[in-house]
């Protein structure tokens, strides 16, 4: 069993969601980073054949610039996460790497559950145009992070950032937004 983090972005999970249709941009995979404390997710469209160096670039551009270096990272045994480059990088940054074990969901079950949910949302959101899923990914990410999660009793934005960003509906219907609070 993994220890529970005490603050946002102290411990994260990383995974790749593959098996998506190739888009006009050539993307067929989503690199997922999930904060284990707030359940906030960062999702980046990419190609399934991405290498460890490119994965680290996405991480630093999409996660580190906003949340800093985590103390620990949980990932599956994808070759991108097993490379010498990847291990050396995190060792230099004093970040502990933990590899999940197949058939032991307690090591990283939340990531797999979130992955299934995101694939389902992407398929629903893009049912008429399945090869444009990467263009809707930012909206799916925002919706996911704004949704109530029973395991934390709130939404990831509130738990991870201390506030919930406004949406167009909040601006268009301010009465509805204040009633929800």
What are these language model-derived features?
Residues 20-22, 45-51, 127-131, 181:
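Short, contiguous acidic/charged loop-to-helix segments that flank catalytic cores in large enzymes
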Residues 3-6, 16-18, 38, 48, ...:
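Short, flexible loop/turn elements at secondary-structure junctions
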């Amino acid at each position: 069993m993994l220890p529970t983090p005490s603050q946002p972005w102290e411990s994260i999970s990383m995974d790749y969601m593959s098996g998506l249709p190739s888009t006009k941009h050539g993307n067929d995979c989503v690199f997922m980073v999930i904060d284990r404390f707030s359940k906030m997710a960062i999702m980046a469209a990419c190609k399934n054949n991405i290498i460890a160096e490119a994965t680290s670039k996405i991480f630093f551009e999409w996660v580190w610039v906003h949340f800093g270096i985590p103390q620990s990272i949980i990932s599956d045994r994808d070759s991108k996460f097993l490379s010498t480059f990847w291990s050396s990088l995190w060792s230099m940054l004093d970040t502990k790497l933990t590899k999940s074990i197949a058939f032991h969901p307690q090591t990283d079950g939340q990531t797999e559950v979130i992955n299934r949910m995101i694939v389902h949302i992407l398929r629903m959101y893009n049912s008429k145009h399945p090869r444009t899923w990467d263009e809707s990914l930012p909206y799916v990410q925002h919706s996911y992070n704004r949704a109530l999660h029973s395991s934390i009793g709130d939404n990831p934005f509130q738990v991870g950032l201390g506030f919930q960003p406004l949406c167009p509906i909040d601006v268009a219907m301010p009465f509805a937004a204040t009633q929800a609070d």
